[in-house]
Amino acid sequence: MIIWLSNFLEQYFPFFRLFEYLSFRAILSIITALSISLWMGPKLIRWLQNLQIGQVVRDDGPESHFSKRGTPTMGGIMILTAITVTVFLWADLTNPYVWAVMFVLLGYGAVGFVDDYRKVVRKNTDGLIARWKYFWQSAIALVVAFALYAYGKDTAATQLVVPFFKDIMPQLGLTYILLTYFVIVGTSNAVNLTDGLDGLAIMPTVFVAAGFAFIAWATGNVQFANYLHIPHIPQASELVVVCAAIVGAGFGFLWFNTYPAQVFMGDVGSLALGGALGTIAVLVRQEFLLVIMGGVFVVETLSVILQVGSYKLRGQRIFRMAPIHHHYELKGWPEPRVIVRFWIISMLLVLIALATLKVR
């Protein structure tokens, strides 16, 4: 929105030309989202406490988690508010890629909100019925997938980028829709599974968003895209502002979510953030790099799949408890140790993924 205003005012006040620079708007995006989160946090926490909207803890979970009962949840409202306000302030709202990410972010946020509401207000520990949750996740992802395919059909926007091979970029055709669907839904649920310890999910989300900010800038810059042998997609550059908003909002939320947490993001936050990251990965054509950068999310998800599969096939569990962060807790690791080590691994994976851009 501000960029529209600056286009008018710069003829009278040259200072407003600064808002045309992507880097300047990205910095302002981080600051704005961070400020909104820090300002909103205490108010939201008090409001949630007054409504007695507290975390539901499983009786069969680690004993260390029993003390978390009653901690305010649905803090993802803070994250989504900060991101939404920031994006509408600093992003170019004529860019369809911005709207695609925001549609998924808010759509999945709505699904997560209903799920959280049923859990903590209606006292239904199962939350939203699984088939309905999956239905709405699928519907939102398919709407975006079909829209993006129609918009970018037979262009660089629908090519498959294979790491390490600069000349292998086949057109996906209708397979693009299927891939987009699985990436968005899969990433959303992976982040949701990871959100089990104080600050565990938000920092990897911040790291991945920061990595995608660089990739979005490179993809939107024709010279840098050619240098790295990745598709040049002009619209992708505006996603830098969106990624910056996620980073700022994430840091602001971490202020209150760090151990011991004052608030949890809930499904309203984790489903939305995961869906947004998946959408960004699709838009910049780096689905494979998402698997590397989001390796923590991938491992958490695989641990659940392997645990359930092993128990059903062999009657035995592989881990003491899944997702895998609970396995390490039950092995005696203090919660902060699990969290920080997963953060370190996540940061390294993002750096490795960015390094692969040059290895072609």
UniProtKB/Swiss-Prot annotation:
PROSITE patterns cross-referenced by the UniProt entry: MRAY_1, MRAY_2
Metabolic or biological pathway, per its Swiss-Prot or TrEMBL entry: Cell wall biogenesis; peptidoglycan biosynthesis
This protein's UniProt keywords: Cell cycle, Cell division, Cell inner membrane, Cell membrane, Cell shape, Cell wall biogenesis/degradation, Magnesium, Membrane, Metal-binding, Peptidoglycan synthesis, Transferase, Transmembrane, Transmembrane helix
Membrane topology: Multi-pass membrane protein
Molecular function GO terms recorded: metal ion binding; phospho-N-acetylmuramoyl-pentapeptide-transferase activity; UDP-N-acetylmuramoyl-L-alanyl-D-glutamyl-meso-2,6-diaminopimelyl-D-alanyl-D-alanine:undecaprenyl-phosphate transferase activity
Pfam families: Glycos_transf_4, MraY_sig1
UniProt subcellular location: Cell inner membrane
Annotated transmembrane regions: 21-41, 73-93, 94-114, 132-152, 168-188, 199-219, 236-256, 263-283, 288-308, 338-358
Keyword Cell inner membrane: yes
Domain of life: Bacteria
Disulfide bonds: none
The protein's required cofactors: Mg(2+)
Catalytically driven reaction(s): UDP-N-acetyl-alpha-D-muramoyl-L-alanyl-gamma-D-glutamyl-meso-2,6-diaminopimeloyl-D-alanyl-D-alanine + di-trans,octa-cis-undecaprenyl phosphate = di-trans,octa-cis-undecaprenyl diphospho-N-acetyl-alpha-D-muramoyl-L-alanyl-D-glutamyl-meso-2,6-diaminopimeloyl-D-alanyl-D-alanine + UMP
The keyword Cytoplasm appears for this protein: no
Enzyme Commission designation: 2.7.8.13
Function text: Catalyzes the initial step of the lipid cycle reactions in the biosynthesis of the cell wall peptidoglycan: transfers peptidoglycan precursor phospho-MurNAc-pentapeptide from UDP-MurNAc-pentapeptide onto the lipid carrier undecaprenyl phosphate, yielding undecaprenyl-pyrophosphoryl-MurNAc-pentapeptide, known as lipid I.
Family, as annotated: Belongs to the glycosyltransferase 4 family. MraY subfamily.
Protein name stated in the entry: Phospho-N-acetylmuramoyl-pentapeptide-transferase
Annotated source species: Aliivibrio salmonicida (strain LFI1238)
